[in-house]
A protein has these predicted regions:
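Surface-exposed extracytoplasmic segments
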Residues: 8-454
Length: 454
């Protein structure tokens, strides 16, 4: 098809209900064989939350929801049911025993201690964070088996008794420089032991630059650009591609200065592959209590009271599925569904509507520009078994599990060696790099171009 170069947000504000709760909105999910030097045999999972964070998002910036359960799930045997889950629960605290820092205001004899309105009152570094007025901590729980009924084990850092999250990047007056902030954030990488696992795992939670690339505004304005490569090859800069076509430029990336909050876990592959064939499926979810009652006299510690069963409100495995495949009336249903129940969404995969929508938008313009009489720009191979393989079953010999249960998740073959960062192809398997998407997903994989070529 001629129309192949659109860029879409992977899962930013993808369903009506989740737009009302950005703190539990999963934006992207990654699973890959670790390629950092010295980390052979490890698998990294990254779940990004809270989309479209502005660098100037003060004074409160972007804290995680203390009422939520954030989870990374792993299916090691292909039955579409989690075998291992890592669950994050956050606690937000103010300095001075949760009262907040107060400063003496006024002259002697008429002085009052008054609380400050900011999250810090001075510089912060890896060596000294005493000026911080706000902090986030989190517990990490491993659930073996079903998320609801499985065995729960509280995990703790090898040093200390609580995991902590760095403050968001406030600016250079607070952190001196981006390099110093990086050093500060690195001090929040923790090692922890997994029961029955010989080697240590690692975890990090903190604000990162959003690695996804998207022309967000124009894309959802009915693709308000020519969605075909305008150069002879991406980045060539010669203008010898499709007449008037879009070219590769940072000017087209509406997420260039946006951040997300990453929940990252790196574990030995042998600890999550179980008795399967080395291929694992994974996804992330966020859940909230069913009921919330607002406190009419809200305080920092108790703005509301929540109760009832934890209810899944966000879900993300493979990129683009809920964003571009699921119909708008079923997006919230997908967000709350379990992979084992994905049969209800089969028609969206076997007979997707997006290609036909693009055909309606661009067929006449393409024929006019090229002087052709193309009958349709959309694929005609129905049912779309190619999409079923890409999103629901995995590719035989690459990332298909021994037991095949059609379900949407990100599948990774842990037996395929990681490709060093400098040698990776952004096109993953399509670029002869078997360690990339759709065999898992790395932050640098160009999932849009890959998916639109399936």
């Amino acid at each position: 098809a001629a129309v192949t170069a659109c860029a879409f947000a992977s899962s930013h504000r993808e369903a009506p209900n989740i737009t009302r709760a950005p703190a539990v909105d999963s934006t992207d999910f990654y699973a890959f064989n670790s390629y950092e030097e010295g980390r052979d045999g490890y698998v990294t999972f990254i779940a990004n939350y809270i989309p479209l964070q502005d660098a100037y998002g003060g004074p409160n910036y972007f804290a995680m929801d203390p009422n939520a359960h954030y989870a990374i799930h792993i299916d090691s045997d292909g039955d579409a049911v989690e075998d291992v889950s890592f669950v994050f629960n956050f606690t937000n605290m103010l300095a001075a025993d949760n009262e907040g820092i107060a400063l003496p205001i006024g002259p002697e004899g008429n002085q009052k201690m008054v609380k400050v309105p900011l999250k810090n009152i001075g510089g912060i570094s890896a060596d000294d964070s005493s000026a911080a007025n706000f902090s986030e901590m989190y517990s990490l729980t491993m659930v073996s088996g079903d998320m609801q009924s499985g065995e729960r084990t509280t995990l703790t850092p090898s040093m200390g008794d609580m995991f902590k999250k760095p403050l968001d990047y406030i600016g250079n007056k607070t952190f001196t420089s981006e390099a110093e902030y990086a050093r500060y954030a690195e001090s929040f990488i923790y090692s922890f032991a997994i029961p029955g696992c010989d080697d240590m795992a690692r975890v990090f939670v903190g604000q990162r630059k959003d690695p996804f690339v998207v022309n967000l505004g124009k894309t959802f304005d009915l693709v308000n650009y020519v969605p075909v490569e305008g150069d002879s090859a991406p980045g060539a800069g010669d203008g010898e591609g499709f007449p008037g076509g879009i070219t590769q430029s940072e000017n087209n990336d509406d997420l260039l200065d946006k951040n997300v909050t990453s929940l990252s876990v790196e574990v030995p592959a042998t600890c999550v592959t179980g008795d399967g064939n080395g291929v694992i499926g994974s996804w992330t979810t966020a859940s909230l209590p069913q009921a919330t009652i607002l406190n009419p006299d809200a305080t920092f510690a108790k703005p509301s009271v929540s109760g009832g069963a934890m209810t899944q409100v966000s879900r993300l495995g493979s990129p683009l599925v809920n964003e571009l495949v699921i119909g708008i009336g079923d997006k919230d249903t997908f967000s709350s569904a379990h992979p084992s129940d994905d049969g209800q969404f089969a028609d969206y995969v076997t007979h997707p509507s997006l290609p036909e929508l693009l055909n309606i938008l661009f067929k006449d313009a393409v024929n006019t520009t090229l002087g052709t009489d193309i009958e349709t720009l959309a694929p005609t191979n129905f049912p779309r078994t190619d999409l079923v393989t890409a999103f629901l079953t995995g590719f035989p010999g690459v990332n298909q599990q021994a037991t095949v249960t059609p379900s949407e998740m990100l599948r990774l073959n842990t037996g395929i060696p990681a490709t060093p960062a400098e040698s990776q192809s952004a096109f993953g398997v399509a670029g002869d790099d078997l360690a990339g998407f759709p065999n898992g997903r790395r932050p640098g994989d160009d999932v849009v171009d890959i998916a639109l070529r399936v």
